[in-house]
Amino acid sequence: TQVLEELDRSEQYRGTPLEGLDAFQRQLKRFDIKVSGPGSDPVERFFATSAGAALFPEYVSRAVRQGMERVSQVNDLVATVTRIDGMDYRTIDAEDETWQAAVVSEGAQLPQTTLRLGSGLVPLHKRGRVLSSSYEALRFQKLDLLTVALGQIGAGIAAAQLEDAVDVLINGDGSKDGITFASSTSLSYADFLKLWGSLAPYQLNAIAAGTDGIQKLLQISEFKDAQAGLNFQGTGKLVTPLGAALVHVPGMEEGKIIALDKNCALEMVQAGDVLVDSDKLIDRQLEKISVSAIAGFARIFEGAAQGVSYTVE
């Protein structure tokens, strides 16, 4: 997208019917390629000209990103997203997480919090998938249908990244250790009140749990709130009586539930954008579409996440 924008800047189209479209969308109009809707073109439409074929990797990248954004719950856990160009990155580390502004007398020194670089590199993971098919199987298929398949690849990448985020909270990121889990034989409302208290001065605004954990949470009588039920039926979003968003992580280890302040707990690090193997894409005539994304997670402030473990029946 950035390369296309440099070649065909949007500023040139102010006051025209094409205002509001980015460079890629304008090129689709130029070559009369429809990628969505009932009247979407077949895949081979991209390859009618060499210039049109050059747009195909960007189409794949956008379709995958749409799938990632559609299902991603990572944003419910991370405080910030950092984009880097390389593979080496160190996050910050606070020597003292005491944030209270103490009263000082005139001329006295103010208390300080020192930030330094983390002791280790943030581990990055490459997640991706290869969509393999013969040219004959795809050439007459509509782009709208291919977008659905590519979106599922994006959804799979987003799900894996969500599990990576939770793994960093549980096991640490190499510089900071994993969170502390309080033990409980059976989950109760009192356990969550203790979590709420242990997080102070941070706020409890997100709870991450696996399928078993979510089911047990929803069985707690205090969580059977009428308004929360209406919100779930109307929007599909789970909200607890404590005001925290429930994040369902299907691959998360059973017997553990994490409570965190999503504004202070995690940093997401992305190395580049969604990558498409465009060389094989053209040379092998769509036999294989390789899509990948590189990302990792780092803990920011250790006190911003706590956990509770329970006995799995």
What are these model-predicted stretches?
Residues 114-119, 141-142, 172, 207:
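Hydrophobic alpha-helical bundles in membrane proteins
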Residues 42-127:
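Assembly/oligomerization interface modules of large self-assembling protein complexes
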Residues 1-53, 313:
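Intrinsically disordered, low-complexity terminal tails
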Residues 127-201, 313:
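Alpha-helical scaffold segments that mediate packing/assembly in large oligomeric complexes
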Residues 221-313:
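Sequence/fold signature of self-assembling virion shell proteins
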Residues 171-239:
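Extended, solvent-exposed, turn-rich assembly/linker loops in the middle of proteins
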Residues 99-102, 141-142, 216-218, 298-300:
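Short helix/loop capping segments that flank catalytic or ligand/cofactor-binding pockets
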